């Protein structure tokens, strides 16, 4: 990805897809303008202080569930270690997320159910964590309400754009 970015003289990155596609875009963004190895950005390590700026990153999700379009973290497989690692930098986040329910209409029913359940779990996690801000609990409850009112509907009627948009 980095060589494609450099050779094309691109000035930004657009990541489209599910969580893995967007995580791939975030990983490329971390190293696109920097000489560091991707694994230098591992979450368990202290953030690198002297870096070139990260290219603007736009995320376009095609599923409802991971929330990857809102986060700076990315899960990437390290083939040498045979495991997934979390990479990130606090100054690298998507500048915008473009949400278009039309992009989820062709999602197979099983993926609609799986990613919708993933969104449900994220909402439960957010509500159950000790929150410093009561607004976070309100947002979690609103998310759970939207999922409860729309997940079964999009599973049964994949073309329902209102329900897809609510997911």
Task: List PLM regions with ranges.
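Short alpha-helical scaffold segments that flank and stabilize functional sites
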Residues: 3-4, 27-28, 32, 122, ...
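Short, surface-exposed, charge-dense and proline/glycine-enriched linear segments
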Residues: 12-24, 44-51, 75, 89-91, ...
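Generic hydrophobic secondary-structure packing signal
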Residues: 21-23, 112, 119, 136-139, ...
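N-terminal small/polar loop signature for handling phosphorylated ligands or for N-terminal nucleophile
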Residues: 1-37, 153-164
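Active-site segments that bind and position negatively charged phosphate/pyrophosphate groups
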Residues: 126-167
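A glycine/threonine-rich phosphate-anchoring loop and its flanking beta-alpha core
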Residues: 33-134
